Amino acid sequence: MTDTAASSPTRAAGTSWLGWLEGKLSWILLGLVGLLLPLLDDSYIGVIAQRAYIYWVLSAGLNLVVGYAGQIAIGWVSMLTLGAYTTAALAAGRIGPEWNPYLALAAGGVMGAIFGVIVGLPALRLRTFYFAMTTLGFATIVTQVALAWKDVTGGGVGTPGPTFSWPFEPGWGFYYFCFILAALATWVTANIGSSRYGRALVAIRDAEVAAEASGIAKPKLLIMVFLLAGALGGVAGGLFASLQSYITPDAFTFEMSVLFFIAILIGGRGSILGPALGTIILTALPEFAAPLVQWSTFLYAALLLLIVLLIPGGIADLLDFKNRRPLEQHREIAPRKELLSRALDKTDGRHGIVLKDIALHFGGVRAIDGLDLEIRSGEVHGLIGPNGSGKTTTLNVISGYYKPKAGTLTLDGADLPFDRPHLRANYRIARTFQTPRVVGAASVLENVMIGGTVHGQATFTEALLSLPRNRRDEKLLRAAAMQALATVGLESLADVRADRLQHSELRFMEIARALMLRPAFLMLDEPAAGLSPEEIRRLGDLIKAISREGTGVLLVEHHADLIFDICDRVTVLNLGKMLAAGTPNEIRSHREVVSAYLGA
């Protein structure tokens, strides 16, 4: 990413002080309540608030796992258990000499981080409910170890929790300690959520294939998130042990584990404010509905059902006033091709992707059968053929999603690796998809910024602490994304949620996201599908302008007129084999092509 992008005068709407206040108002109110609550001098309410803040610390980290990354971690109570027993055992001197409670709390966080990664590793391979069962199984194991390891945990009898000294001694001092740690947990997770790492997590959750095409490496990112979530869970456990004064395995119930998970869903997954509100509600509810304690499980289930049915986006959706504003009905997409020189790196010389004798079979079906194809820089290469002829499969081979049984794939004579699609971004190979792959709950601007994830320089830790290099990354990514949106004609919709766009706008938004890679080669999979004739004409002009900047374009399309109008060369596939290749005029008059595809 270059500094040129940052100098673009275009900026997202809604960045005035009023927009800033609208986004921060809920946090300001929560902060004021937290700071002023001790003035009530009600110890009962103080204990409830302390428990809410402790759960908030855990939920802040769990929100990155469940809300952002979309991993169903139901058994995250295990991190609370590990942190509680580690802190309590070290502070009580059950493992060597007695530790200072503050150091013991830090050790609880480290223990949570270690086991957070261990528990998270299966998520790299397991999906949805299989991973959920893994987390529940681990929580059961931790509880059984706590029962059996009597020398350290006290077994079923339990062990005393740590007592923190000045300035956070029991009472309102400890209240402020919990409040400060909840605020810190919220700050660091909000920093991650608003960084390229947070956008990458949401892309993995809602559009994993597009995330890979944007160069996002899922395993490394998930490990870092599980480490952070585990650490926060461990710290919450240490605080919980102190609040309880005495802990036993019975304190860490299945209902508590479900409570944390439900808090994320009720509050609104993928938001920072939502899970905090969800945690507060679910912590306070049992206290103020004590006569109905035997119905607690039923009430949790009913509340979750109501939220899912009535406000599936959670409480955070109710507070998203900006995206309730009506949009103009008759919107026009007007690309500005003159901006492409800033959005792309001019390619000098001749470069090419070459497929040689590629073969790919699915069982007995020959999806690609001995295909030869060359995509040259500065040219638009059309790929046409009947449905099932292997067009999209060819794009998937080039993009690294499929590994062929035979043949070679080279870029400028060097082999391209198969089965690692996220590495294609390193070669500046970008693509769009037959069905737009977008993050509906994110803004148009955020969706496009996902495409530039690989250009960021800040580490996960720098994003966590919002250090200068991370802030610079965000400034450059935002400017580049606004420039890409202006190029395709969507800059006025930058702050609109992507799921509010028309189909044609999603098509152009995908192209803007692909432009964020400053691609040397661009693969377009039926970009004209669902577009009006005028939109198709503008799309064709944009694609041709992209190729004139030196980018090689492979265009898979069923609109023959578009192919013949803008392509320099055309390849026709039929049943996985190349039926013909040549200029548009040659293909238009090819007898077999006319018979098999174009019609008489």
Where are these regions (language model features)?
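Transmembrane alpha-helices and adjacent helix-loop boundaries
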Residues: T2-K337
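Conserved structural motif at the start of ABC-family nucleotide-binding domains
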Residues: I353-L355, I368
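The feature captures the beta-strand-to-loop junction immediately N-terminal to the Walker
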Residues: I384-P386
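Helix-to-loop junction immediately C-terminal to a conserved catalytic motif
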Residues: S399
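A short, surface-exposed alpha-helical micro-motif characterized by mixed small hydrophobic
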Residues: I563-D565
